[in-house]
Swiss-Prot record:
Quaternary state and interactors: Homodimer.
Protein name (Swiss-Prot/TrEMBL): Dipeptidyl aminopeptidase BII
Covalent S-S links between cysteines: 70-87, 166-174
Regulation of activity: Completely inhibited by the serine protease inhibitor diisopropyl fluorophosphate (DFP) and potently inhibited by 0.5 mM ZnCl(2), 10 mM o-phenanthlorine, phenylmethanesulfonyl fluoride (PMSF) and N-tosyl-L-phenyl-alanyl chloromethyl ketone (TPCK), but not by N-tosyl-L-lysyl chloromethyl ketone (TLCK). Activity is not affected significantly by protease inhibitors, such as chymostatin, leupeptin, N-ethylmaleimide (NEM), iodoacetate (IAA), L-trans-epoxysuccinyl-leucylamido(4-guanido)butane (E64) and pepstatin A or by CoCl(2), CaCl(2) and EDTA.
pH dependence: Optimum pH is 8 for the hydrolysis of Gly-Phe-pNA.
Annotated phenotype, changing residue 86 to A: Loss of enzymatic activity. Loss of enzymatic activity
Effect of residue 574 to A: Decreased enzymatic activity to 83 percent relative to wild-type
Family statement drawn from the similarity comment of this UniProt entry: Belongs to the peptidase S46 family.
Temperature-dependent activity: Optimum temperature is approximately 30 degrees Celsius for the hydrolysis of Gly-Phe-pNA. Stable at a temperature below 20 degrees Celsius for 30 minutes.
Annotated keywords: Aminopeptidase, Disulfide bond, Hydrolase, Protease, Signal
Reported impact of residue 675 to R: Acquires the enzymatic activity for synthetic substrates with Asp/Glu at P1 position
């Protein structure tokens, strides 16, 4: 999920880092900063040189890859990639049927010939180069003058040209990242591997043990890991899926640690964290806490209940909506945890006090501080503008995101954009984007059931007719033809006649021109044609606000950074899906008075949670192996068993899932897959006492592959077999 560049995560300029007081735990450091914080890294226990881990194409960093929403790493010279089970969940679900349910049973390819495609849109991105383009980006924006919409379009044009030049070399995918709300811009160039195959996934009763009950919780006992393999053409260059392709040979791959990890040991994570908001305005925080999180969580829970009920009657729904449900569950529980955490640490009060101090400092500077004060006022005004239509915007977006309407609106928009020169098309509809659009159309039926889609459409139409008059959309009202349950039923009955449920039909429209859409009698396409002018108008309004933000946000954030520097504080960029490193130590925590959590869980803890019912229904092979104390030489004598999961004080967020956890020597000791319940609010206000990362221990991964769901071929490939 790609965040809008123009609303990229708020951060502070890296040049203002006060490295001398940086410490382990808090901080998502860009690799270029690592030599500056060499002291804290060494103090925490790093044995490698900071210069070595800041070499992004060397060992070990060159082994870390992005999946587009998750992180992974190469673990063999033959293109084997390890990530989280939940990151591979979509691929597992895509290859599952009610009769052959890989989600439940697992997948273990005996040979590379038996590996299956992870889907047409599965990707492995291997970082090749990072270039600072701040000067050119700012010049392009400045040339647009005072017109807000022109500023947005100027940045878009700059980005498109920059990316087109970067991607002139075949096989690469490039992306422009904004830091500090527009104070810094960097271009990332990645090798784009397009043939990704599922090699191994443990049964769901291992990979998702504890399910949504244990999600975000400690103690934890989840084997959250899976393996892909990256393939390329025989010439070694990226190519679409083909039986003739061969495994990719990375320059670097991670080796499993040969020293046992213990409490207090140094660990670090390299990955692609999605978004944090630690430098957001207090009012922006308040809007999120009071409306955004509660509202989205409520809608997701309602939809979860709908799909669960339907799934009990239809196994096809249960399988096809598994990945969607996992996402809804994860997000809604995360938001609940953040809201609880906000209250526990008085996040609202902290944000208000911090902002009051900054504003007071600026006022004390007289004329020098006025531009930042004006920028702050402008940001508040922009927030109020967005709040005025937030219910409409959310409802319309999620209604249009249901399967058939999502396909119809995307396809019609594509036909409109195709009338323009490629450089002038909206991002997401350029020639570079067509394979992803086509891939999504091809795999939609594996995640769609008509009866379920109708229920979801009905849910959002019922939400729409509840909107106040000033938030209604004339085009939708005209299409709906009423404001009651009868009108909703008529609309649903019309939409049921769409033919877009067929892959063949969707691909036909993928190649159609605009006139064909506007002459169509398909009800989903007719809806898209009816509402598109309004959608385009609303998009222009958002871009105008984004242009205002481009002028105000960097000014205020620069002032915020200056204030922090004056107070002797260190600063680091908010997460924005770019490569980051976080470091710290293995340690437990005390969630409540009189309660102390140790940092490791064990095999015996898995058995203690066993109920025989989902989600605590371990495979018989696991229970038998634990009962026989068949540890396979992987036990840690300090805890008397094989460690399953462990805690550390590292700073991660969504997007870090699947990130390799490295020890002091750069060896693999596990995979990041979650945070504890008390940590989720740290996306906004970091709490060092409570924030902990949860990782699956590398020894548990190996134990499962050795004793429970054997994959000797992969263990041998990773040079860790018996």
């Amino acid at each position: 999920m790609r965040p809008n560049l123009l609303a990229a995560a708020i951060a502070v300029p890296l040049s203002l880092l006060a490295a001398q007081i940086a410490q382990a735990g808090e901080g998502m450091w860009v690799p270029q900063q690592l030599p500056e914080i060499a002291g804290p890294l060494k103090k925490a226990g790093l044995k490698l040189s900071p210069q070595q881990i800041s070499d992004l194409t060397g060992d070990p960093m060159g082994a870390v890859v992005a999946l587009g929403g998750c992180t992974a790493s190469f673990v063999s010279p033959n293109g084997l990639v390890v990530t989280n089970h939940h990151c591979a969940y979509g691929a597992i679900q895509l290859n599952s049927t009610a009769e052959n349910n890989l989600i439940k049973n697992g997948f273990n390819a005996p040979t590379t010939a038996d590996e299956v495609s992870a889907g047409p849109n599965a990707r492995v991105f291997v970082l090749d180069e990072i270039t600072d383009v701040t000067k050119d980006a700012k010049a392009a924006i400045a040339a647009a003058g005072d017109d807000a919409l022109a500023r947005t379009k100027a940045l878009e044009a700059f980005e498109k040209k920059l990316i087109a030049d970067c991607e002139a070399e075949a096989g690469f995918r490039c992306r422009l990242y904004s830091f500090s709300g527009g104070n810094t811009y960097r271009l990332f160039k990645n090798l784009e591997i397009k043939d990704v195959r599922l090699a191994y996934a443990p049964p769901g009763s291992v990979g998702k043990f504890g399910g949504d009950i244990d999600n975000w919780m400690w103690p934890r006992h989840t084997g959250d890991f899976a393996f892909y393999r990256a393939y390329v053409g025989k010439d070694g260059k990226p190519a679409a899926f083909s039986k003739d392709n061969v495994p990719y040979q990375p320059k670097h791959w991670l080796k499993f640690a040969d020293q046992p990890l213990g409490a207090g040991d140094f660990v670090m994570v390299a990955g692609y964290p999605g978004s944090t908001n630690r430098y957001a305005l207090a009012a922006e925080f308040d809007n999120t806490a009071q409306w955004t999180y509660p509202t989205i969580a409520r809608h997701y829970k309602n939809q979860i209940a709908m799909v669960e009920a339907a799934g009990k009657q239809n196994a096809d729904i249960q399988v096809k909506y598994a990945a969607t449900m996992a996402g809804w569950n994860n997000t809604s529980k995360n938001y609940d945890g953040q809201l609880e955490g906000f209250k526990r640490i008085d996040a609202a009060g902290q944000k208000l006090r911090e902002e009051a101090a900054v504003l007071g400092w600026l006022k004390g500077q007289g004329a020098k501080g006025q531009p930042a004060l004006d920028a702050h006022a402008k940001l508040l005004d922009l927030l109020e503008q967005s709040k005025a239509t937030r219910d409409r915007d959310l409802t319309l977006a999620l209604f249009n995101n249901t399967a058939m309407l999502g396909s119809a609106t995307q396809l019609y928009r594509l036909s409109i954009e195709r009338e323009k020169p490629n450089a002038e098309r909206e991002s997401g509809y350029q020639e570079r984007d067509l394979p992803a659009i086509e891939g999504g159309l091809k795999q939609l039926e594996r995640r769609y059931v008509a009866a379920m889609d109708r229920q979801l459409q009905e849910y959002w139409l019922n939400e729409y007719i509840k909107l106040p008059a000033d938030q209604r959309v004339a085009a939708v009202d005209a299409w709906l033809g009423g404001n009651d349950a009868a009108a909703v039923k008529r609309a649903l009955d019309r939409l049921a006649g769409t033919k877009l449920g067929s892959t063949e039909e969707r691909l036909k429209w993928f190649a159609a021109d605009r006139k064909a859409f506007e002459a169509s009698n398909d009800p989903a396409i007719q809806y898209a044609v009816a509402v598109m002018p309004t959608l385009l108008k609303l998009e222009q309004e958002r871009k105008t606000r984004a242009g205002e933000n481009l002028a105000a946000r960097p000014v205020y954030l620069q002032a915020l950074a200056d204030y922090k520097k004056s107070q002797g504080e260190f600063v680091y960029p908010d997460a924005n899906l770019s490569l980051r490193i976080t470091f710290g130590n293995v340690m437990g925590y005390a969630p409540k008075d009189g309660m102390e959590y140790t940092p490791f869980t064990t095999l015996e803890g898995v058995v203690a949670k066993e109920t025989g019912q989902d989600p605590f229904d371990s495979p018989k092979a696991l229970l038998d192996a634990v009962a026989a104390k068949r540890y396979g030489g992987l036990e840690d004598k300090r805890i008397g068993s094989v460690p399953v999961n462990y805690l550390s004080d590292l700073d991660i967020t969504g997007g870090n899932s699947g990130s390799p956890v490295l020890d002091a020597h750069g060896k693999l000791v596990g995979l990041a897959f979650d945070g504890n319940w008390e940590s989720v609010s740290s996306n906004w206000v970091f709490d060092p006492k409570m924030t902990r990362m949860i990782a699956v221990d590398g020894r548990y991964l190996r134990w499962i592959m050795q004793e429970v769901y054997p994959a000797p071929q992969l263990l041998k490939e990773m040079n860790v077999g018996k």
